[in-house]
C-alpha cells in the first residue's frame, strides 16, 4: 500500500488507552510484575474519586487504568468478550473495547508465549492469521500476516501479544466491503472510496 499521511492532524500514534479496574494493587502486580511494564505515573483523584495509574507500553505509548470506588461489575459478553479467540464467542457490545494488542517482534514471539505460560498466565491457542477461508494456519506460511496469542488480565480485559510477520501492506490487502448495521454490504464505502493522498 502506498505510504500515506494524515494531512488534517499530526497524529503520532496512541498516547494512552484508559481502562477501569476493580483492584489497582492487583492490576499493578499483573502489568508491572507479570508483564514487566514500568509504572510511570500514579494519581489519587481529588475528593476520594479514585485513582488513575499509567504503565509504559513502549514507543512513548501508555496503558492507563482508573479505579473508581463504585464502578459496576464487568459483564463478560457485553462489556468485553466472553471467550478468547480460538475458544468461542469473541463478540462484545457496541462501543466496548474488545481487546488490546501489544506489538512484539517476530523473533521473540514463541519465547514470549512460553514466558507467559511459565508465569502462570492462561493462554488461548497461538493463532497464525492468514488469508485462507478459515483465516488461521496451523503453521507459519508466507500467507500468514500476523501471529497472535490471547489472554486475560485480572479484570477480564482481553490482551494479545501480536507480531506482524511481514513489513507493510499491499493495496490488495484492502479487499472487503464494510457492512452496515444490518450486516449488508450495500454502501460501497471501502472499495469505491477514493485512495488516500500519498505522502510527498
Description of each model-found segment:
Residues 1-9:
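A detector for short, charged/polar N-terminal pre-domain segments
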Residues 12, 24-25, 82-158, 166-170, ...:
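Vicinal oxygen chelate
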Residues 16, 51, 147-148:
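Conserved beta-strand and immediately adjacent loop positions that scaffold enzyme active sites
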Residues 20-72:
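Core segments of cupin and vicinal oxygen chelate
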Residues 63, 159-162:
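Short hydrophobic beta-strand motif reused across regulatory alpha/beta modules
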Residues 74-79, 170-173:
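A short, polar/proline- and glycine-enriched secondary-structure boundary/capping micro-motif
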Amino acid at each position: 500500500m502506498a505510504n500515506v499521511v494524515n494531512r488534517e492532524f499530526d497524529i503520532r500514534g496512541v498516547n494512552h488507552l484508559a481502562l477501569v479496574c476493580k483492584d489497582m494493587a492487583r492490576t499493578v502486580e499483573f502489568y508491572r510484575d507479570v508483564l514487566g511494564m514500568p509504572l510511570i505515573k500514579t494519581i489519587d483523584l481529588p475528593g476520594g474519586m479514585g485513582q488513575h495509574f499509567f504503565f509504559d507500553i513502549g514507543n512513548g505509548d501508555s496503558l492507563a487504568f482508573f479505579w473508581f470506588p463504585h464502578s459496576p461489575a464487568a459483564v463478560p459478553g457485553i462489556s468485553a468478550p466472553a471467550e478468547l479467540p480460538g475458544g468461542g464467542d469473541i463478540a462484545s457490545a457496541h462501543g466496548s473495547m474488545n481487546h488490546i494488542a501489544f506489538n512484539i517482534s517476530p523473533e521473540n514471539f514463541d519465547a514470549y508465549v512460553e514466558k507467559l505460560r511459565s508465569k502462570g498466565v492462561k493462554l488461548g491457542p497461538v493463532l497464525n492469521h492468514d488469508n485462507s477461508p478459515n483465516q488461521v494456519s496451523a503453521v507459519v506460511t508466507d500467507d500468514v500476516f500476523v501471529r497472535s496469542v490471547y489472554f486475560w488480565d485480572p479484570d477480564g480485559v482481553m490482551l494479545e501479544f501480536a507480531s506482524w510477520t511481514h513489513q507493510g501492506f499491499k493495496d490488495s490487502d484492502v479487499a472487503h466491503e464494510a457492512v452496515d448495521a444490518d450486516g449488508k454490504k450495500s454502501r460501497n464505502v471501502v472499495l469505491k472510496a477514493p485512495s488516500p493522498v500519498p505522502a510527498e
